[in-house]
C-alpha cells in the first residue's frame, strides 16, 4: 500500500542484527523505489528516505546527513509521516530527534517530491539493513504489540484508535485499517 495524503504515525522496534554489519534503516520508500538497487544511495532509486542506526538520514541519491542520535537493538523508533507538508520525523524511545516537533511542523526531514515518484508523493513504510546479513524488526501500526510483546503505555491517536508505546503527535493518525479507511 502507498500513502498519498495525510499525517501518519507508526513505531518500529529494532530487535537484532546478525553478523555485526553496519546499520538498520527505518523510513519510507516511493512507489518507484527498488529494494535491490542499493537503496537509498543510488540516485535512480526513487523516493527513499530512511534513518540509519548512526542517526543520519539518507534520501534518494544523497550522502548521509546528521539528524539525530544513534539507535540500536531494543530501541523503539517512532515515525511521523506528514504528506501535507512533505516531511518525515523520527523519535527514539519517545523523544523526537533533531529538536523536531511534528505537531508544530518544525524540524523534520524533507521528502522528495520529484517526478521520479509515481504518483508524486506516494510513500510506503520500509525497514531494511545495510552491510549485515540479517536484521529483525517488529512494527506496531496500532495493534498494541511488537510481535508478541505488548506495549506498556497504550497511547491512542486523536481519533481514539491505536495502542502505541509512545504518544502519537497531535494531528497524526496511527497507520491501521480503521484510520486508512476513514482518513486515507
Where are these predicted regions, by residue range?
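PRY/SPRY (B30.2) beta-sandwich protein-interaction domains
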Residues: 1-184
Amino acid at each position: 500500500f502507498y500513502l498519498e495524503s495525510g499525517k501518519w504515525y507508526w513505531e518500529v522496534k529494532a530487535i537484532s542484527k546478525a553478523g555485526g554489519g553496519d546499520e538498520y534503516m527505518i523510513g519510507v520508500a516511493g512507489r518507484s523505489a527498488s529494494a535491490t538497487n542499493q537503496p537509498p544511495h543510488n540516485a535512480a532509486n526513487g523516493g527513499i528516505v530512511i534513518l540509519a542506526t548512526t542517526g543520519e538520514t539518507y534520501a534518494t541519491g544523497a550522502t548521509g546527513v546528521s539528524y539525530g542520535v544513534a539507535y540500536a537493538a531494543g530501541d523503539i523508533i517512532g515515525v511521523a509521516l506528514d504528506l501535507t507538508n512533505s516531511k518525515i520525523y523520527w523519535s527514539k524511545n519517545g523523544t523526537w530527534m533533531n529538536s523536531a516537533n511534528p505537531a508544530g511542523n518544525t524540524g523534520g526531514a524533507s521528502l522528495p517530491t520529484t517526478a521520479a515518484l509515481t504518483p508524486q508523493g506516494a510513500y510506503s513504510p520500509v525497514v531494511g539493513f545495510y552491510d549485515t546479513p540479517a536484521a529483525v524488526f517488529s512494527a506496531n501500526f496500532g495493534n498494541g504489540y511488537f510481535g508478541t510483546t505488548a506495549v506498556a503505555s497504550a497511547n491512542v491517536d486523536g481519533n481514539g484508535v491505536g495502542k502505541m508505546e509512545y504518544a502519537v503527535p497531535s494531528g497524526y493518525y496511527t497507520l491501521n485499517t480503521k484510520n486508512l479507511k476513514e482518513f486515507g
